């Protein structure tokens, strides 16, 4: 039970004190739940170092990376440890697979396709992510984003060394975003990467400050490389400015570490963080599954259509499969909007395993939309338009218009024609089936 020690006086002061105590108690309890024990950290480091020693015997240099190296690891059912294998030249990377196949590994080896292929060594409750990187002293000359990963580790470790308490604050941010489906730079999630959360929490000075501050600032330059937000927007590649948030990489000023963050994911994050700040609870750190029942009830209340879709693909499970299916789902959502179907709620659900995913929507369906045709003064085009559209045409504001019959089902049938191009298939899951 929470006690308000010394919080007497006006009601609003008492309320504020209660909030502060509640937040502290929640975070204290959550830290106990997500902190990896010293013994477990030692065990994980042992697994990683044994593997690195095996690589060294074969002439390869490797380092521990990721959350384990930075001291920001949180409890998970299956831990993943980044192992960066450093090469002098990109051509040398090709020999890594041959070496790994000849080694006696602590688990099953799996090739994972990405911007640069890497490897998983599945050891049961631990997965070693073996990532080849090319050593470089100038991030601007890096051939691949993974080549600057070691500089990310050095930056975060340096900040944690200056302020050891910030490591726990970063853990809160990772656990919170993971629970609320906002964590992961994978294409099917389009959430915060672990590194972006580390930068943001360090910049704002804590987890709670991050949740509050991110609502007020969407262009962030931690190292103050640029004189103004306008200069940032001018200097960074336009392709890196499409998302809702611009965060300049402290290790390379021309990179936006939040370039992959999706608008829908960010909006959901803002919504849930606002609720948490108003009423702190451990429930916000529990994995949020898609509330199908709630979506159905919402659809009923709004007199809208609830839609459940199943996606399949033949692409490699994980990021590639998930991204293909998510891209197809987002294409369908865009086509619904083009046809003036009111998309009220959207959820995509892929576990990261397998080649199936689900999409859920609540849509306020329209049966008819008005489509503008040629100007009344353009006689030849107008005649062709009227002949082609029949009795559905009418005049309005100097143009011919056409009443087009539309529906969610028609849009779904239309997008099915793109299955081969999208690399995924879709079908509607009917209620009770």
Model-identified regions with their sequence ranges:
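Conserved nucleotidyltransferase catalytic core and NTase-mimicking acidic/glycine-rich helix/loop elements
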Residues: 165-348
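Extended, charged low-complexity segments
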Residues: 347-433
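Internal, well-ordered alpha/beta segment that forms a basic, Gly-enriched binding/recognition surface
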Residues: 126-180, 205
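Conserved catalytic core of two-metal-ion nucleotidyltransferases
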Residues: 97-141, 336, 344-357
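N-terminal regions immediately upstream of nucleotidyltransferase
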Residues: 15-76, 92-94, 119, 133-139, ...
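Short, conserved charged micro-motifs
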Residues: 90-97, 209-212, 369-371
């Amino acid at each position: 039970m929470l006690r308000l020690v010394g919080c007497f006086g006006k009601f609003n002061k008492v309320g504020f004190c209660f909030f502060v105590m509640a937040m502290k108690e929640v975070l204290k309890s959550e830290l106990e739940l997500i902190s990896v024990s010293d013994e477990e950290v030692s065990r994980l480091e042992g697994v990683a170092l044994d593997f690195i020693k095996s690589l060294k015997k074969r002439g390869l240099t490797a380092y521990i990376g990721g959350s384990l190296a930075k001291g920001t690891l949180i409890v998970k059912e299956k831990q993943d440890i980044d192992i960066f294998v450093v090469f002098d030249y990109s051509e040398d990377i090709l020999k890594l697979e041959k070496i790994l196949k000849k080694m006696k590994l602590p688990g099953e080896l799996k090739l994972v396709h990405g911007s640069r292929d890497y490897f998983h060594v599945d050891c049961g409750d631990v997965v070693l992510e073996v990532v080849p990187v090319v050593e470089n002293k100038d991030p601007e000359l890096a051939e691949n984003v993974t080549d600057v990963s070691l500089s990310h580790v050095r930056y975060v470790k340096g900040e944690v060394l200056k302020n050891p308490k910030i490591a726990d604050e970063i853990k809160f941010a990772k656990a919170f975003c993971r629970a609320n489906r906002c964590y992961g730079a994978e294409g099917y999630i389009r959430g915060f990467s672990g590194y972006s959360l580390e930068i943001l929490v360090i910049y704002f000075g804590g987890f709670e400050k991050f949740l509050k501050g991110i609502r007020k600032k969407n262009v962030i330059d931690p190292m103050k490389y640029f004189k103004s937000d306008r200069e940032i927007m001018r200097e960074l590649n336009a392709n890196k400015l499409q998302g809702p948030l611009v965060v300049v990489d402290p290790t390379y000023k021309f990179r936006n570490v939040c370039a992959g963050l999706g608008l829908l994911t960010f909006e959901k994050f803002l919504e849930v963080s606002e609720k948490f700040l108003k009423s702190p609870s451990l429930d916000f750190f529990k994995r949020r599954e898609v509330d199908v029942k709630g979506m159905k009830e919402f659809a009923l209340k709004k007199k809208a259509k609830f839609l459940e879709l199943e996606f399949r693909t033949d692409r490699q499970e994980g990021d590639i499969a998930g991204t293909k299916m998510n891209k197809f789902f987002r294409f369908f959502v865009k086509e619904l909007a083009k046809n003036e179907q009111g998309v009220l709620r959207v959820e995509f659900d892929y576990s990261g395993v397998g080649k199936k995913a689900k999409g859920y929507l609540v849509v306020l369906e329209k049966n008819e939309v008005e489509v503008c045709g040629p100007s009344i003064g353009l006689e030849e085009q107008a005649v062709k338009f009227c002949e082609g559209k029949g009795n559905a045409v009418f005049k309005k504001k100097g143009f011919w218009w056409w009443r087009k019959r539309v529906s969610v089902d028609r849009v779904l049938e239309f997008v099915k024609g793109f299955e081969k191009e999208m690399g995924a298939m879709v079908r509607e899951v009917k209620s009770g089936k």
